[in-house]
Amino acid sequence: MILATARVLQNVIETRVGDELWTCRPVGGAANPIARKIEELFSTVYRTYRPSAPDEIHSTVSYHPKNDEIIVQVGEEKWRTKSSVFGPLTLVYGGIQYTINEKLTGRFAMLRGGKVIATGEVGFRTCKIKEYPAELEMILADLALGYLIRTLFWEMLR
């Protein structure tokens, strides 16, 4: 199971991937500590750190509200979701196209060739993905973070 949880007062997102607990921190570039904290509060770009290498960035996940897309970057590789106004999100990963059908209840399903391969649910401060193939665990963990960033962004504007 993958469980991403926003710790709003600490300004971090913790993502449990199997037995590992990833720490996801917002990106802030200002030199002034107060300006950096304010910048981090409104950031839609997060870096993930794994416990096996706590000082090394595992991935960078960002949400871009203008195009309603989530971008995941691991090293030199980059994947992005494509959004359409009335259709599902799409993602090409490993040369295979996946579609993500979302419901207003926060539940979603990831499909490959019309067959459901992963299911999950997004709340205000959590994103849980229960069933999924093992080979998709890393990208799904980053997508869970992206969904949570998107939810936090839109809740902030409410």
Which residues are covered by each model-predicted region?
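A general, composition-driven signal for non-globular sequence regions
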Residues: M1-A4, A31, R50-I57, I71-K78, ...
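Low-complexity or membrane-interfacial segments used for flexible interactions
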Residues: M1-T44, N67, V85-R158
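Acidic, aromatic-enriched beta-alpha/helix-loop junctions
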Residues: I38-H58, S62
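Helix-adjacent hinge/juxtasegments
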Residues: E56-L89
